[in-house]
């Protein structure tokens, strides 16, 4: 299973400010830092997300078709997380709402470096 995902950034301080505030919404915070890399998680034994200035010295670019999905436990949390991302300067890529008939509820946005993220939950069916 996935341990963590890393996204590139060209401005680590700006990315840290964005993710510090955003990931607080789901109980995650910084747990590992170096000069070029910062990792976030709810706990060191839980999946996480990292941001990094590329080690090859080239500019960070967005992966075409790449997306990071963060799971929460309710549509309300999807809505809150999405609104927080937009308030922090993220770009809308799909407003919160149900997708299909499976109970999948999601929202999509791009962070300040253009990386695409999704926040989702599975609604309980009655």
Predicted regions and their residues:
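Short glycine-enriched loop/turn motifs at secondary-structure junctions
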Residues: 1, 61-64, 101
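Mid-chain, well-packed structural core segment of small domains
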Residues: 67-99
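N-terminal beta-strand motif that seeds the catalytic metal site of vicinal oxygen chelate
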Residues: 1-16, 68, 123-126
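Long, continuous compositionally biased terminal/linker segments
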Residues: 41-80
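Conserved active-site tyrosine of GNAT-family acetyltransferases
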Residues: 15-19, 85, 114
């Amino acid at each position: 299973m996935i341990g963590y995902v890393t996204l590139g950034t060209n401005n680590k301080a700006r990315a840290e400010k964005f993710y510090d505030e955003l990931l607080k919404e789901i109980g995650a915070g910084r747990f590992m830092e170096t000069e070029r890399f910062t990792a976030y998680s709810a706990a060191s034994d839980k999946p996480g997300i990292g941001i990094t200035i590329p080690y090859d010295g080239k500019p960070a670019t967005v992966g075409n078709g790449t997306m990071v999905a963060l799971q929460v436990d309710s549509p309300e949390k999807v809505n809150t997380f999405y609104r927080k991302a937009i308030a922090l300067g993220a770009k809308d890529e799909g407003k919160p709402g149900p997708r299909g008939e499976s109970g999948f509820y999601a929202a999509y946005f791009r962070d300040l470096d253009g990386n695409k993220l999704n926040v989702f939950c599975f609604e309980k069916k009655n």
